[in-house]
Design a protein with these regions (language model features):
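Local sequence-structure signature of Cys/Sec-based thiol-disulfide redox active-site neighborhoods
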Residues: 1-23, 27-32
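Thiol/selenol-based redox catalytic cores and closely related redox-interacting motifs
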Residues: 34-126
């Protein structure tokens, strides 16, 4: 199952959701401001990201800038707690399934969410 972490008013989030719908891919949307992410979800996001916090945390977010926060100095427990209470620091959208992890909307990379058997059919038709 594809999970999409979104926020209201996010243009890239809308692009991802529209692309998934156009390609008839089922997904579960989680608005990070409507539901509080649990600790295991946050740890899972951190584990799945290739570059740790750099991939999923916006260092330019208001709370990080105004408070001069260095997430690299935090323990995992502190980081998870920080994200849980400040979801606005997460880059959006975050899209993942069992095999693929994507932050943001990238027209080429998002194709990885199409199952291999369907990708082969598309390529064969070309």
């Amino acid at each position: 199952m594809i999970v999409v972490y979104t926020s209201p008013g996010c243009a890239s989030c809308r692009k991802v959701k529209n692309w998934l719908k156009e390609n008839n891919l089922k997904f579960l949307e989680k608005n990070i401001f409507q539901i509080q992410l649990n600790q295991s979800e946050i740890k899972h996001l951190l584990m799945r990201s290739e570059n740790g916090t750099d991939d999923i945390i916006s260092k330019r977010s208001k709370i990080i800038q105004e408070n001069n926060i260095d997430v690299e100095e935090m323990s995992i427990t502190e980081l998870v707690d920080f994200i849980q209470h400040n979801p606005s620091v997460l880059k959006r959208p975050i899209v993942l399934n069992e095999k693929t992890f994507l932050v943001g909307y990238d027209e080429e990379e998002i194709g990885a969410f199409i199952p291999a058997d369907r990708r082969e059919k598309v390529i064969t038709r070309l």
